[in-house]
Regions:
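Cysteine/selenocysteine-centered motifs that mediate thiol-based redox chemistry or coordinate metal-sulfur cofactors
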Residues: 124-157
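A long amphipathic alpha-helix within ATP-dependent nucleotide-binding catalytic cores
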Residues: 66-69, 73-76, 80, 123-136
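Well-ordered beta-strand positions
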Residues: 1-3, 43, 90-91
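A hydrophobic, small-residue-rich beta->alpha segment in the mid-to-C-terminal subdomain
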Residues: 85-129
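Residues immediately flanking
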Residues: 14, 68, 102
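A short, polar/proline- and glycine-enriched secondary-structure boundary/capping micro-motif
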Residues: 21-22, 75-77, 108-112
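Phosphate/ribose-recognition catalytic cores of enzymes acting on nucleotide-derived substrates
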Residues: 34-74, 80-87
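Charge-rich, low-complexity N-terminal segments
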Residues: 1-37
Length: 157
């Protein structure tokens, strides 16, 4: 875990995997885990989202998974935890962007798991993220290579 400006970076590196992991993203099939790949978690102070950047063995981003959250904080074990608001946004460097789990958010509202304020916050943040990704302006995506290098320089890998 690395503090980097107003962000906390957590880097998980896969040295050898038994089998690559592929996911679907807006009609694309994307490999997010294989030998040498890394998952970089980016948590900005005060942000309403937590980003997982999936990077290939060369450190190039291949996929972003963005959890929409109410808040995040450092847990007693020193690792980040967050209050998930159900919605997620996934994207690829090729420009595919997809909103996930809208039905889960609707069900959570109907079951009083989230308040109407949390529901509106989730929708607003997800919309902001989608528009920023589509416009190439979502900072965690734009700065993935920089964040990856910073995290690796501290871990010495």
């Amino acid at each position: 875990m690395v503090s980097y400006g107003d962000a906390v970076l957590v880097l998980l590196e896969a040295h050898e995997v038994v089998e690559p992991l592929w996911v679907a993203c807006a009609g694309e099939r994307v490999k997010i885990l294989d030998d040498g790949f890394a998952w970089l978690f980016v948590l900005h102070e005060g942000a309403r989202h937590v980003v997982t950047a999936h990077c290939d063995a060369a450190g190039e981003p291949v996929h972003w998974y963005v959890d929409v959250v109410e808040d995040w904080w450092m847990g007693d074990d020193g690792f980040p935890v967050y209050a998930d608001l159900f919605l997620d946004v996934v994207a690829t460097p090729g420009g595919s962007v997809e909103l996930l789990d809208a039905a889960e958010l609707e069900a959570a509202l109907a079951a009083d798991v989230v308040t109407s304020a949390q529901y509106e916050l989730a929708l607003s943040e997800a919309d902001r993220i989608v528009r920023a990704l589509q416009g190439g302006r979502f900072e965690p995506a734009v700065r993935t290579r920089e964040f990856h290098s910073a995290a690796r320089s501290v871990t010495g890998t």
